């Protein structure tokens, strides 16, 4: 006669015990994060490396040299470098992290001076958008910073000038700066001088790019001439 052995109830429950609170090991998540960081495009990693942890330390020169070498060696990446720098700068302007804004513009100035290839045109468009962002800010320091960068750009002779590029915004903005009414006399003077320098830069750049017909159009002259005469009158009043 067959004999059956009954399995204890406790053992049955134990055999099918399921731990619903099971979670993956943290180290696996960290590994995935590390992989994601490694997959970031090289140009983004090179750009990120030029920014120190403390903006007071200034531009990381060794990493800036690497970024410049990469940009010169791979000019087709210039537009992406410019777009990414513009993204970072816009974010830092909104967050009032002006130390990093200064570093970004210094990097842009160096890249403009180093690169003169056909591929620089898309990069210049990103650069001009960033300059416009600074000029539109209500911070005199950023307005002067943007003007200085634009003047440096105006002194650069591009290998192939862009005939479709227009500077309407900059004519209007620099002309408005010439009429600054800041309550602080020193800041007011600083902004007005920056406006005059900006107008000079626009004229120089349009002449170099053979866009003379554009700059002499009435809609531009109606802003430039009164702005210059206004400041000349102020100088005479002081004298």
Feature names for model-found ranges:
Residues 151, 175, 200, 226-229, ...:
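A broadly conserved amphipathic alpha-helix scaffold signal in soluble, globular proteins
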Residues 19-24, 52-68, 81-88, 97-112, ...:
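HEAT-repeat alpha-solenoid elements in large eukaryotic scaffold proteins
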Residues 28-36, 67-78, 93-97, 115-124, ...:
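HEAT/armadillo-like alpha-solenoid scaffolds in large eukaryotic assembly and transport factors
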Residues 48, 90, 109, 131-132:
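Amphipathic alpha-helical repeat scaffolds
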Residues 2-91:
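N-terminal "cap/leader" segments of large eukaryotic alpha-helical scaffolds
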Residues 42, 46, 84, 173, ...:
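Charge-rich, solvent-exposed alpha-helical interaction surfaces
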């Amino acid at each position: 006669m067959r004999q059956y052995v009954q399995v204890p109830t406790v053992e049955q429950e134990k055999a099918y015990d399921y731990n619903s609170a099971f979670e993956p090991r943290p180290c696996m998540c960290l590994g995935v994060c590390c992989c994601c960081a490694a997959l970031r495009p090289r140009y983004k990693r090179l750009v990120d490396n030029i920014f120190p942890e403390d903006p007071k330390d200034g531009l990381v020169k060794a990493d800036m040299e690497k970024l410049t070498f990469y940009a010169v060696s791979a000019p087709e990446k210039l537009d992406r470098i410019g777009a990414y720098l513009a993204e970072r700068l816009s974010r830092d302007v909104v967050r009032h992290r002006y130390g990093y804004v200064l570093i970004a513009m210094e990097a842009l100035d160096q890249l403009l001076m180093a690169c003169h290839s056909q591929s620089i045109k898309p990069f210049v468009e990103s650069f001009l958008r960033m300059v416009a962002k600074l000029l539109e800010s209500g911070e005199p320091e950023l307005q002067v910073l943007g003007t200085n960068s634009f003047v440096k750009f105006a002194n650069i002779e591009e290998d192939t000038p862009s005939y479709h590029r227009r500077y309407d915004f900059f004519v209007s903005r620099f002309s408005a700066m010439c009429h600054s009414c800041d309550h602080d006399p020193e800041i007011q003077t600083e902004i007005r001088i920056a406006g005059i320098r900006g107008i000079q830069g626009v004229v120089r750049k349009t002449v170099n790019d053979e866009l003379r017909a554009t700059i002499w159009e009435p809609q531009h002259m109606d802003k430039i001439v009164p702005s210059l005469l206004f400041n000349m009158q102020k100088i005479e009043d002081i004298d």
